[in-house]
Regions:
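Polytopic membrane enzymes that build or remodel cell-surface glycoconjugates and lipids
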Residues: 1-243, 249-250, 255, 259-265, ...
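Alpha-helical linker/edge segments of TPR/alpha-solenoid repeat scaffolds
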Residues: 276-281
Length: 291
């Protein structure tokens, strides 16, 4: 009953709790249990029911939203995402609201990441008798695939917030490989990990003065124009038109595929308004592009 309550509370917090149900079934299968045994299925019915309700709610909220508009299937990014968030778990540096992602898919790095993804599958299979390793690995994988690929929207699929819950799976899997005789080592390393993430979180909060500050910080180590567009919108809403125009003109010159069509409509309408008095011809062109 306690696990059901915790699962329910987790679903209210984040859709990323939903893969927990699939992980439960996969654990039974990989550990050699009969997945569709009556007792096994009955024990999971409450989780399945709760997950179904929250899935319907999530789909209802997303049905009117524009999906990822890249010229490739977002599933091709899965190996890159798995490696990216894994790297951020162990090296939480240059954290951002949203990150650049590969624009050239079939590169050497893309091939290497796919090979690494296959190797990860072998590693999971090899440790299938380790329940904590299985749970952590599968929870991490299911979260990333569900939340950043299957339901990619708006700022997906590379953003810090998608890793908040997911990387717990990585640490559970990693710590499960430490022998039971090394409990002291586990406590020391675990304490250091918690301390590091506490310090990183504290450092990040220094940039949280307002949303404009967050996007400005993002521009210090991200090269795409997406952040300019998001910051420009905030400038425009605050009436800081000169700053907004500079950001919007940057994204006009270097368009970003993460922007949905309606965002470009907003951008060109704003540029049209801001250039009405200074350049009527250009303003008319902007309004025309907005439509």
């Amino acid at each position: 009953r306690a696990s059901i309550l915790v699962f329910l509370l987790g679903c209210f917090c984040k859709i990323q709790m939903l893969p927990f149900v699939g992980v439960l079934f996969l654990l039974d299968y990989l550990r050699g249990k009969r997945v569709f045994q009556k007792e096994t299925v009955y024990s999971k019915i409450p989780f399945v029911f709760i997950a179904f309700i929250f899935t319907c709610v999530a789909l209802q909220f997303r049905k009117d939203q524009t999906a990822f508009v890249g010229d490739y299937n977002p599933f091709l990014l899965v190996p890159s995402q798995i490696a990216w968030y894994g790297m951020k778990a162990f090296f939480p540096l240059n954290l951002s609201i949203v990150y650049d992602w590969p624009t050239v898919l079939f590169s050497k790095a893309f091939v290497a990441l796919n090979v690494g993804f296959i190797a990860l599958g072998f590693l999971i299979f090899r440790n299938r008798r380790n329940p904590l390793f299985l749970f952590g690995s599968l929870f991490y994988l299911a979260n990333i695939i569900l939340h950043t690929t299957l339901f990619t929207r708006f700022l997906g699929p590379y953003a810090d917030r998608y890793g908040y819950l997911s990387i717990l799976g990585i640490w559970i899997a990693a710590f499960s490989l430490v022998g039971q005789k090394r409990v002291k080592t586990l406590h020391i390393v675990g304490g250091l990990v918690v301390a590091v993430f506490f310090l990183v979180a504290r450092q990040q909060t220094t940039h949280w003065k307002d949303t404009i500050s967050l996007w400005s910080k993002n521009l210090e180590h991200q090269t795409s124009s997406f952040s300019n567009g998001m910051r420009g919108q905030l400038y425009f809403e605050k009436g800081m038109y000169a700053a907004a125009q500079r950001d919007f003109e940057i994204i006009e010159q270097d368009p970003d595929p993460r922007f949905e069509p309606e965002k470009y409509g907003y951008l060109y309408s704003a540029l049209g308004l801001m250039t009405t008095e200074s350049d009527g011809v250009k303003s008319a062109e902007y309004f025309d592009r907005a439509t």
